[in-house]
């Protein structure tokens, strides 16, 4: 039991840093989904596309 507590105390950074990275990637993906839903509803991007023109925001 003491050895487990010592390991946790010494190596907590090795767990929290990757966990923060994964949570950040998840939040970034959710933010991109919300922005994609809003993409062509704003006045800035709401216009007709020219022939052979790609979407305004990917």
Swiss-Prot record:
Its main location: mitochondrion. It is found in: Mitochondrion inner membrane. The chain crosses the membrane at residues 11-27. The keyword Membrane applies. It is a single-pass membrane protein. Accessory subunit of the mitochondrial membrane respiratory chain NADH dehydrogenase (Complex I) that is believed not to be involved in catalysis. Complex I functions in the transfer of electrons from NADH to the respiratory chain. The immediate electron acceptor for the enzyme is believed to be ubiquinone. Complex I is composed of 45 different subunits. This is NADH dehydrogenase [ubiquinone] 1 beta subcomplex subunit 1. It comes from Pongo abelii (Sumatran orangutan).
């Amino acid at each position: 039991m003491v050895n487990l507590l010592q390991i946790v105390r010494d190596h907590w950074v090795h767990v929290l840093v990757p966990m923060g990275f994964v949570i950040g990637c998840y939040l970034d993906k959710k933010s991109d989904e919300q922005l994609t839903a809003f993409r062509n509803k704003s006045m800035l991007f709401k216009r007709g596309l020219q022939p052979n023109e790609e979407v305004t925001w990917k």
